[in-house]
């Protein structure tokens, strides 16, 4: 169960960042800033720090300082294959505090709390935009404090170090061993806290909280992240408009349908589901609160595209609040008008202003369609099935049914079990869309063999499976191909 997680996301890729842009702005703004990184053991502080140094190493010199793990171990565990840092950027004070990657004349032989400031001052002189990371700062302090009879407090030493960093233009990262508030937060310029929780099903959720970043506007304090493949990666928002197709003369190749499955149209999701949706199965797409009105299309549009490209029929009852013309405009960008008219029918339900004729889908476009899908202005079950059968006559094999349970409540209120049997009998696939407050939400779950939930995590969008059980999956968009490709990043 492995989704792709490229080391360096190209500019055409949305939804994943290798370092939060707010923290990058914090360090590339006013010189000499100090960042305190809080978090309990196991939250990912070291990987966060290594990733930050990797990013900042492109602009200047960096040095990772520790006292508990030797250089080779740090390199093999956190750096090799994941970052561009050289071994010489990793320093173990307990082994060789003077084994520096730059030529420095240090005016003392033993390092302690008093000489630490002179040491920092000495190595900053020949360096270019130096960034120093102490992991962890308290352990470094305690290691050096043991060489004093009456050592100054960690707050005193931190004050002195932060003042020196400002004067010398050195960027500091001080890693803490706790997520609780400490007096150090009032000394430094920026504070971030890493959190991790596991629910009762073992699903891991990681969040980075931006407590304060001097000189930087924080629009979203909570940012989800992942440590997949041993790398820190932030999960970032995706503009839904970028998930939709635009006209392109290049050839688009649909994904193949395995023998017992239908491709979801999302390569990463097919991998997780061992090929895609079950033939004859029902998928429950459970929408969380605060999603935008077209968020449902992120998972559904790729499947619709793939069905139509394979000349299989699609019947769609979209949410009432969905954008008018969304499906028609997207699909017509990559499929011919003949394919759309012959194999797809959208039951128009938009509750807003009247749409232009060009955006509308004529309910009688399909040849021989003489049955209206509504009774007394409301979608009804039997006319829906009759229309689906008309689509089947002009398509190659099974159908995909995409149905908003809010929109189709009256049609399926007492017929959901019948519909599931119909889907199984014809070897079709169906996606039932529900949202908070949907009356048929529980019933949809009972007839479904797959249950996915789409929800907000900060400003980002994440997907996860309840059946089958999956980790949180950050949603991204790769726009380097003919059409936008949805990507999924495991959040572990």
Curated annotation (Swiss-Prot):
GO cellular component, one term: cytoplasm
Record-level Gene Ontology MF annotations: ATP binding
Keyword line: ATP-binding, Cytoplasm, Nucleotide-binding, Plasmid
Pfam families: GvpD_bR2, GvpD_P-loop
Further details from the record: Encoded in a 14-gene locus called c-vac which produces cylindrical gas vesicles only in the stationary growth phase.
Physiological role: Causes a decrease in the amount of GvpE protein. Gas vesicles are hollow, gas filled proteinaceous nanostructures found in several microbial planktonic microorganisms. They allow positioning of halobacteria at the optimal depth for growth in the poorly aerated, shallow brine pools of their habitat. Expression of 2 c-vac DNA fragments containing 2 divergently transcribed regions (gvpE-gvpF-gvpG-gvpH-gvpI-gvpJ-gvpK-gvpL-gvpM and gvpA-gvpC-gvpN-gvpO) allows H.volcanii to produce gas vesicles.
Protein name stated in the entry: Protein GvpD2
Organism: Halobacterium salinarum (strain ATCC 700922 / JCM 11081 / NRC-1)
Organism lineage: Archaea, Methanobacteriati, Methanobacteriota, Stenosarchaea group, Halobacteria
Name of the coding gene: gvpD2
